[in-house]
C-alpha cells in the first residue's frame, strides 16, 4: 500500500519535471530552435492546431528558420499566429515559405527570459511539493487507520522526502542549464 503511494508520487513528479522541461523549451534563446513554436496555435479549418502540425520547420542557419506549410493556403494563418505569439519574432512571407530570423537578445531581454525560466522552475517545484504533501497525507491516513505501524510510515515518509529532493534537484538543474544557455552571447 505504501509502496503504491510512493510509486504514484514518483510518477506524478516525473511528469512534472517533463512538463517543466517542455515548458522551458518554449523560452527562446538567441539560437533558432523549432521547439520554440510548440506553443504557437493557429486556426486550421476552425480547429486550434499547433503550427508544428501544419508545417515543416527547418533550421538552415544558426539564427534562421524556414517554415513550409503542408498546405499553401495556410501560410497567412501560420504567419499571423507567429506574429501574434509572445515569441517576439517577425516572419517574412515569400508566398512559398515563411522565414523567421531570430533577433539577437539584448541583455535586458536575456535577464527577463532568465526570470521567466526561474518562474517556470518554481512552478514545477511547487507542483512537486504539492504531490509530496498529498503523499504525506495518504501515509498519515494509513497510519491513522491502523493499516501500518509508525516506523513503517516514518520510513516511507523519509523515502518520499528523498524522492522529492531528487526531483526538485532535477528542476533546479533544468533551470540552471536554461539560464546558462540564455546568458551565453
Curated annotation (Swiss-Prot):
Its main location: cytoplasm. GO terms for cellular component: cytoplasm. Keywords: Cytoplasm, Protein biosynthesis. InterPro entries: Ribosome_recyc_fac, Ribosome_recyc_fac_dom, RRF_sf. It is found in: Cytoplasm. SUPFAM superfamilies: Ribosome recycling factor, RRF (SSF55194). Responsible for the release of ribosomes from messenger RNA at the termination of protein biosynthesis. May increase the efficiency of translation by recycling ribosomes from one round of translation to another. HAMAP family: RRF. It comes from Corynebacterium urealyticum (strain ATCC 43042 / DSM 7109). It holds the Pfam family RRF. GO terms for biological process: translational termination. GO terms for molecular function: ribosomal large subunit binding. This is Ribosome-recycling factor. Coiled coil: none annotated. The keyword Protein biosynthesis applies. Belongs to the RRF family.
Amino acid at each position: 500500500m505504501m509502496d503504491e503511494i510512493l510509486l504514484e508520487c514518483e510518477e506524478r513528479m516525473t511528469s512534472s519535471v517533463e512538463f517543466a522541461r517542455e515548458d522551458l523549451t518554449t523560452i527562446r534563446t538567441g539560437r533558432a530552435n523549432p521547439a520554440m513554436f510548440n506553443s504557437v496555435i493557429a486556426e486550421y479549418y476552425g480547429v486550434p492546431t499547433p503550427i508544428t502540425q501544419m508545417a515543416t520547420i527547418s533550421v538552415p542557419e544558426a539564427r534562421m528558420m524556414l517554415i513550409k506549410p503542408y498546405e499553401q493556403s495556410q501560410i497567412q494563418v501560420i504567419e499571423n499566429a507567429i506574429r501574434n505569439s509572445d515569441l517576439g519574432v517577425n516572419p517574412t512571407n515569400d508566398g512559398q515559405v515563411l522565414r523567421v530570423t531570430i533577433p539577437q537578445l539584448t541583455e535586458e531581454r536575456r535577464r527577463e527570459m532568465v526570470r521567466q525560466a526561474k518562474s517556470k522552475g518554481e512552478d514545477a517545484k511547487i507542483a512537486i511539493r504539492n504531490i509530496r504533501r498529498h503523499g504525506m497525507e495518504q501515509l498519515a491516513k494509513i497510519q491513522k487507520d491502523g493499516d501500518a505501524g509508525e516506523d513503517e510510515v516514518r520510513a516511507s515518509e523519509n523515502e518520499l522526502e528523498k524522492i522529492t529532493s531528487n526531483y526538485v534537484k532535477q528542476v533546479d538543474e533544468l533551470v540552471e542549464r536554461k539560464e546558462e544557455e540564455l546568458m551565453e552571447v
